[in-house]
């Protein structure tokens, strides 16, 4: 198995890495992984729960939506949210600036989709701290129709 490290950042929580590998047992499928130390945070092999979070979380809402997502990862929840025509604005908050940088640099498959959609804003921050004070630091009065975590 050939593993290529695409990104690395030392964080207070450990080493954060973005890896790409080709899985020969799956017909040469390209797999992207985000790891923190020895733990897998995200893999492009298993994305159904991330997609369903957006599909089910937004499915019953039938108006223009302002949505916030906690955690960017490989971007599957955010991309699925943007498929919903009612999503007017999407704010995605991730603890690690490196994860946002990887998307902005096009190192992950969903990076160009998210950075190319004017409805989507990627922002670094502590989602849980911001939940207490307001997710949008530039507009603390901003209200969200859905919070996906």
Regions found by a protein language model. Give the residues of each.
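N-terminal auxiliary segments of SAM/dcSAM-dependent transferases
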Residues: 1-31
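Short, conserved beta-strand segments within well-ordered enzyme catalytic domains
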Residues: 17, 33-35, 68
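The AdoMet/dcAdoMet-binding core of the Class I SAM-like
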Residues: 47-149
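Generic "edge-of-domain/loop-turn" microfeature
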Residues: 23-25, 41, 88
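Pocket-edge structural micro-motifs
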Residues: 20-22, 36-38, 45
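Residue-level preference for alpha-helix termini and adjacent loops
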Residues: 7, 40-41, 71
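A generic short-segment signal for beta-strand/edge and adjacent turn/coil regions
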Residues: 1-5, 35-39, 61, 88-93
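A short, structured beta-strand/loop element
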Residues: 27-42
């Amino acid at each position: 198995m050939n593993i290529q490290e695409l990104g690395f950042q030392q964080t207070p929580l450990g080493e954060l890495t973005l890896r790409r590998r080709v899985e020969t047992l799956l017909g040469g499928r390209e797999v992207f992984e985000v790891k923190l130390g020895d733990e897998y945070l995200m893999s492009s092999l298993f994305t159904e729960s991330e997609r369903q979070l957006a599909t089910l979380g937004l499915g019953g809402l039938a108006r223009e939506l302002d949505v916030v997502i906690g955690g960017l990862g490989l971007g599957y929840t955010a991309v699925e949210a943007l498929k919903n025509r009612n999503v007017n604005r999407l704010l995605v908050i991730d603890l690690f600036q490196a994860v946002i940088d990887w998307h902005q640099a096009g190192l992950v498959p969903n990076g160009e989709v998210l950075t190319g959609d004017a409805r989507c804003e990627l922002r670094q921050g502590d989602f849980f701290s911001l939940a207490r004070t307001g997710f949008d630091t530039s507009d603390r009065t901003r209200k969200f129709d859905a919070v996906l975590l």
